[in-house]
């Protein structure tokens, strides 16, 4: 069936999955390259955001070929295997370690570049996926087509294999002054003023 899927190593569950033996793949509707499911809103580009987290005590136990016995307490959170770095911190904007600079993760587009984000959760923790600068169109939840497409700025992502498909529309903010257009964004960049859609997770 068309949709977004998490693949993972099911042996030694959930430890192998939590330590990185996972990924995402897409099944496109037959005859379509710009829809999540037949009749869905369209998109022009797509990304996978595969979420995970790390409990150092659990990872250390698995590394030593032991079964973790303590309570699961994640301390580090990742998208596509990378963590985020605050501006100015060591590694900030290094695409090898900072998810906000990684071209597989960082949303990049112009006004109207409707972008599908396939959110999948390999970890156990629940997340609230939140972007700034736009609402997202929430299409699916845990592999099920939602009865109506909602515009949301926060989309829940269940733990332990949860998923959500959303479209980030790259629409201009309606009350922005001066009004945002591709022309005004290009002019700002020509003047040395970088314009970007900020994003972080909660």
Description of each model-found segment:
Residues 1-202:
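Copper-binding active sites and cupredoxin-like electron-transfer domains
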């Amino acid at each position: 069936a068309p949709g977004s899927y998490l693949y993972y190593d099911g042996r030694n569950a959930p430890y192998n999955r939590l330590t990185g033996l996972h990924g995402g793949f897409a099944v496109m509707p037959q005859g379509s390259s710009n829809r999540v499911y037949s009749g869905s809103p369209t998109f022009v580009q797509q990304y996978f955001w595969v979420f995970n987290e790390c409990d150092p005590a659990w990872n250390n136990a698995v590394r030593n070929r032991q079964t973790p016995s303590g309570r699961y307490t994640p301390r580090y959170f990742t998208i596509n295997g990378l963590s985020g770095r605050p501006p100015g911190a060591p590694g900030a904007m290094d695409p090898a370690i900072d998810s906000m600079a990684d071209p597989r993760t960082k949303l990049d587009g112009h006004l109207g570049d409707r972008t599908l984000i396939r959110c999948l959760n390999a970890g156990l923790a629940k997340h609230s996926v939140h972007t700034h600068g736009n609402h997202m169109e929430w299409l699916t939840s845990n592999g099920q087509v939602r009865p109506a497409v909602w515009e949301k700025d926060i989309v829940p992502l269940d733990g332990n294999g949860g998923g959500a498909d959303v479209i980030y529309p790259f629409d201009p903010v309606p009350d922005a002054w001066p009004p945002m257009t591709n022309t005004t964004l290009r002019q700002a960049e020509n003047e040395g003023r970088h314009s970007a859609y900020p994003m972080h997770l909660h």
